[in-house]
Amino acid sequence: FVNKLRYAKEKKEIYASSGMGKTTLEEQIELLQYVEKEGQADLLGLSPDSLTRQNDYEAAQRGLEESLKTGKATLNGLPVVNYGVSAIRKMIESVACPVQPRYGAADARLSDEILFAGGCSNTSPDVFMDFWQHSARVSLEKVVETHQYVGRLMGYYSEHGVPLCAGAQGFYGAGIPPSLQTATVILSFILLAEQGVKHVCVKCTGHGNLVQDVVSSNVRCNLLKEYLNKLGYHDVEIFVGISFSLMQYPVEIGANFAVVFMNTLMSKLIGAQMSDIRTVAEAKAIPTKEDIANTFRTAKVMQNFVQAQKIELEKEEADLEAQMEEKEVRSILDKVLEFGDGDILVGAAKAIEAGVLDNPFAANRAAAGKVLGIKDSEGAIRYLNTGNLPFSKDIIDYHQEKIALRESKQGNKINYETLVNDLLSVSKGILV
């Protein structure tokens, strides 16, 4: 996986990636082989089932046995723990492309052990994603403990000549201004670097405003390097991936091809190696292997169209956006470090309690939920409510001015209905 991304970085190529999971090993292999050939894939995905993610292996075994008996899928992915190392190895050796496990869990230690031993060379021990999004009650300390284990295991592999790549995107990000997500991504990678992780893929969430999306990616990578260097981690290799809008997708398949195009264009503009796409039929039904292959091939052709071109954004607007976002991220990170007196975990725990790290759409009840985002007139995400974020007046004023401009153009005040419409806009085939 690392070598593949290095090649993409050198050649300025963009590799599509997407989750794909079947209940039985035979179906999983068939799917991967089909997408690799018919979709012209460069990377393949593997989605473990939700029972495996919850460590309920007995229930996963019952589902697997029922599927094998009836021929009907009863799980929403591959039960990797129940199948074990030899089966994962068989799957990996059945295709030429690297297979990327794509899932989140508060405790994925056993799954990741099996996946690594079976030949997978990538995973996503994403501390804040798995804290915010995947459990209502799990503590940050527990998630950090399990993810430190995975990070140390990845470091062990790297020390012995097997480079493994860790991905993180902080939280799903839809409807939330990017600086908060950037801060959590950087904190996640610092915690992993402490355990010896040497290769990371910075995941970015595109909202559709190309200036903000490009700036956010650049700020995220630059500040990650800066804070890693500041803390003594000078040898971490950084790759970049992006996904466009993690909210509801259009039901109409034709509109979803435009979403795939947008994802690929964003990848080109930010210099990403990986484009996290969702299949064109995903909002309508469970995607077939043909749906997945068509999606991959679409992304491949779009990549071919833009690869040789030099595309740049208007510099003055991008510079101002970068200046403001960098200031926001530093405000959050410096407060976390202050809370912990240099200890990231202590600082993060106190920051969550104080609402300095926040998420309005978190499943976890520990979130203050005071921060709210809204789109401005050009589709960039602005802070409607900054909650307890440690922002200066000029930052708050900047966002309020952008929101006021949208209100002026619309002729009405922003309200809760506006927020909901923003979250659903892509599913309707519009940005704002």
Region locations from a protein language model:
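A generic "cationic amphipathic patch" detector
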Residues: 57, 112, 128, 136, ...
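Electropositive, surface-exposed helix/loop patches at the edges of structured domains
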Residues: 84, 88, 231-253, 311-338
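Short, basic, helix/turn surface patches
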Residues: 73-77, 153, 157, 228-234, ...
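Catalytic alpha/beta active-site cores
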Residues: 1-185, 189, 193-194, 199-205, ...
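Acidic, glycine-enriched catalytic cores built around paired aspartates
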Residues: 1-58, 94-96, 272-432
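Generic structural signal for well-ordered, non-membrane alpha-helical segments
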Residues: 28, 77, 81-85, 108, ...
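Long alpha-helical, hydrophobic tracts
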Residues: 141, 158-293
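Small-side-chain structural scaffolding
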Residues: 115, 120, 189, 263-267, ...
